[in-house]
A protein has these predicted regions:
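Acidic, glycine-rich two-metal-ion catalytic cores of nucleic acid-processing enzymes
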Residues: 120-210
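N-terminal leader/targeting and assembly helices and adjacent pre-domain segments
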Residues: 1-141, 145, 209-210
């Protein structure tokens, strides 16, 4: 999994998260999809704050955090959230486990930096995970429903990457991969083909299936 929030490993000086209504509202999604993603993000936000609270408890007792315990808690809580929207298949199970290890490891390494247990980080992670998981769910549902084509829909705003602007509007068979910069992706935020983190982090592009 790509370490999306620590790509540059720099100190965060301003908020990275965006209010959920704005973050998802600007995406080219149906109202139903937007509501699902807002709901997912709100639940995942609570999960992240719970995990940060566990770290705080360990710190208050001047104890070293139990890596395995916190990872297992995050895995279980993430699965509960995702399970409200889809069945947890092998792909999602593996992704959630790798994500959880990554988050806990990064938090332990950066306990002295307030950002890593902040509301902003919780929200930033939550909005990204809503898109990561539900983009995958949407792709699987499109295949099951017999869709055969897909089109990459980019944001076309000042935050958009040039590589995403370039692929925007591209239509290909549903089982083919988009060429995004130097990466191959089945859909936005997909890392199953080894896409670079720089093409995944905070991506708000979407896909239309036909």
């Amino acid at each position: 999994m790509n370490d999306f929030e620590e790509l540059n490993n720099i100190e965060v000086s301003k908020p990275r998260s965006i209010p959920y209504e704005e973050y998802f509202g600007e995406m080219d999604l149906s109202d139903e999809q937007k509501e699902k993603r807002i709901s997912f993000a709100e639940q995942m936000d609570d999960v992240m704050l719970f995990i940060f609270a566990l770290f705080t408890v360990y710190r208050s007792y001047e104890m070293e955090p139990s890596y395995s315990f916190i990872v297992n808690e995050l895995v279980d809580e993430y699965k509960l959230v995702a399970g409200n929207y889809t069945e947890i298949d092998k792909h999602l199970n593996d992704y959630i486990e790798e994500f959880s290890n990554n988050i806990v490891e990064t938090t332990i390494k950066n306990q002295s930096d307030p950002y890593y247990m902040s509301d902003d980080r919780a929200s930033y992670v939550a909005e990204n995970e809503a898109n990561t998981t539900l983009n995958y769910v949407q792709f699987q549902e499109a295949i099951k429903s017999g869709k055969t084509q897909k089109e990459w829909v980019d944001m076309r705003d000042r935050r958009e990457r040039k590589s995403h602007l370039k692929v925007g509007g591209t239509k290909i068979p549903i089982r083919d991969a988009f060429v995004v910069g130097n990466s191959l992706m089945m859909f936005p935020k997909d890392d199953s083909l080894g896409a670079e983190a720089s093409e995944i982090i905070n991506c708000r592009c979407s896909v239309k299936y036909t």
